[in-house]
Amino acid sequence: MLFVVLQSAATSALALNNCLDNDFADRRGEAVVQIANDDPTNMFRYRPRCVTISEGTLVEFRAVPNFGMHPLFGGTVSGGVATIDPASPIGPFTSGTLGEAMLVAAGEYPYFCDFHFASGMMGSIRVVPELFADGFD
């Protein structure tokens, strides 16, 4: 017998904003997930940078000290060039300290800081279907 393992090209071949498969923190089943640049050793990095969530999760983006210094946009960074996705449900967040996005459709949603993406201040959110209300899928 021959078994073939197929991998999704959307998740394996594309490393949106430098997020590889093993980089994604699994936060499925949580109603609210917070992403912040609050690491005292590296303020130019989001925590978690790459995360998997369930459809319908509210994502809270927190900027330290504020979005005026770290404007956040939905979009990709490739080859050192940031491209804003005007259709992204993320942002833009350019003032204040808290921004929210309700991610209801399965897919991958990359984001970045417009001032510091060259320093690695970017990430991606994978949204997966929640097949059962009890969290088992």
Language-model features: where?
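N-terminal signal peptide c-region/cleavage motif recognized by signal peptidases
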Residues: 5-12
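Extracytoplasmic copper-binding redox domains, predominantly the cupredoxin/blue-copper superfamily
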Residues: 14-131
